[in-house]
């Protein structure tokens, strides 16, 4: 079972505190519209409070980095630390999905350090939403995706791309 917590992952045991937090109009609307996934297996997943907090902080950091033009600077980066089995893939999926909807974001690259993670991440993303992201089998496919070209040279808008650090390094 899962308990509601605050943004510091402190359990909210008091029912009145919970209702003030969860049933606040903006919280409830955000949970329903941003932080739920109806999977390809027709199962509803609701993000845990710490996943929501992580996603909101990443999106907040992206917004600050854009507003203050901190591209490529340490101040513009960050990381989220989750333990094994804590839902990192769901957190990254929703973060990538929400970031890809920002007006000033052309693409979201989700970079993994191993080929098996590339496959595993794509499989999970497809479970969350079929076709929400694209993966690649080579550097040339990655280049095509970055240029918004399909395999026949026509236009295709690749918004979320999953790739390996090795393919990205070769491309750059």
Predicted regions and their residues:
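Inter-Walker segment of RecA-like/P-loop motor cores
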Residues: 127-172
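Short beta-alpha connecting loops at secondary-structure transitions
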Residues: 106-109, 172
């Amino acid at each position: 079972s899962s308990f509601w917590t605050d943004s510091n992952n402190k359990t909210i045991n008091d029912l009145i505190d919970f209702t003030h937090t969860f049933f606040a109009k903006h919280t409830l609307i955000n949970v329903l519209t941003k932080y739920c996934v109806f999977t390809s297996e027709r199962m509803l997943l609701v993000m845990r409070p710490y996943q929501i907090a992580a996603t909101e902080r990443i999106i907040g950091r992206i917004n600050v980095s854009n507003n203050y033009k901190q591209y490529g600077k340490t101040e513009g980066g960050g990381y989220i630390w989750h333990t094994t089995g804590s839902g990192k893939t769901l957190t990254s999926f929703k973060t990538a999905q929400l970031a890809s909807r920002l007006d000033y974001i052309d693409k979201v690259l989700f970079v993994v350090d191993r080929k098996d993670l590339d496959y595993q991440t794509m499989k999970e993303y497809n479970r969350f939403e079929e076709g929400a992201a694209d993966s690649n089998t080579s550097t040339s496919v990655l280049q095509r995706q970055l240029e918004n070209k399909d395999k026949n040279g026509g236009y295709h808008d690749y918004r979320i791309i999953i790739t390996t650090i090795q393919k990205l390094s070769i491309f750059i």
